[in-house]
Amino acid sequence: MHRRGVGAGAIAKKKLAEAKYKERGSVLAEDQIAQMSKQLDTFKTHLEEFASKHKQEIRKSSQFRVQFQEMCATIGVDPLASGKGFWSEMLGVGDFYYELGVQIIEVCLALKHRNGGLITLDELHHRVLKGRGKFAQDVSQDDLVRAIKKLKAMGNGFGMIPVGGTYLVQSVPAELNMDHTVVLQLAEKKGYVTVSEIRESLKWEKERACHVLDHLLKEGLAWLDSQAAGEPQYWLPALFSELLSQDVTPEEANQMTP
């Protein structure tokens, strides 16, 4: 027996059904989008009411500020996106992060002679708090990170390098590639590193290790202790814990190193 072919009428009927399903699907999608948009508008309204009611806590408490910014992020609102507008005018967060950015720049410039433009996030936090005084708004490390990201977007050399669960803040436009970063991470525990340690830990050739260390010396990010026992040590002042609370020159630091 021969199977009967599908007739033109059946094909047309099938296409009509598919078109209706597609149209119905489009209507459902539009309804869902409209509902989601309405829910977002409602959430944004509640968020604005919450911000208005708790603006003093948001300004004063760093923990409260982090939680509020996480709430904003869920609907794509960035209170830091502009220095003007509803959020900045209501909360003053634009001015807060602008002033914090200025403080960060001042601290980094004051210590550049000592650390070459690299500073741990912990030390930066300590010095910013010290400079603000005990009656100023509280500042968290999260606030610092947000302010640094704003500075980085301005293209003035600021950036962050992950080291041992925290960050090194870079405040100079020095070219640091992945090789430089892994050497900084290697030096994190002791504050210094040697060519032999780099070769043993990273399995590099001597020329590669020396090239990276020479670059760090040239940029002022490392100091050389050529009198160290065994072989020269390359100290990273940003990681050198004995110097964290002291403003000393490289000459003074050489007298302190073993």
UniProtKB/Swiss-Prot annotation:
Any Gene Ontology biological process: protein transport to vacuole involved in ubiquitin-dependent protein catabolic process via the multivesicular body sorting pathway
N-terminal signal peptide: none
Species this protein is from: Danio rerio (Zebrafish)
Family note: Belongs to the SNF8 family.
Stated role: Component of the endosomal sorting complex required for transport II (ESCRT-II), which is required for multivesicular body (MVB) formation and sorting of endosomal cargo proteins into MVBs, and plays a role in autophagy. The MVB pathway mediates delivery of transmembrane proteins into the lumen of the lysosome for degradation. The ESCRT-II complex is probably involved in the recruitment of the ESCRT-III complex.
Phenotype of null mutants: Morpholino knockdown of the gene results in a stunted appearance, reduced pigmentation, small head and eyes, developmental delay, reduced forebrain size, and aberrant optic nerve and optic chiasm morphology.
Gene Ontology CC, one term: ESCRT II complex
Location in the cell: Cytoplasm
Subunit text: Component of the endosomal sorting required for transport complex II (ESCRT-II), composed of SNF8, VPS25 and VPS36.
Main location class: cytoplasm
Record PANTHER family: EAP30 SUBUNIT OF ELL COMPLEX (PTHR12806), VACUOLAR-SORTING PROTEIN SNF8 (PTHR12806:SF0)
Protein's name according to its UniProt entry: Vacuolar-sorting protein SNF8
A Pfam family recorded for this sequence: EAP30
Annotated coiled-coil segments of the chain: 28-50
Keywords on record: Coiled coil, Cytoplasm, Protein transport, Transport
Keyword Transport on entry: yes
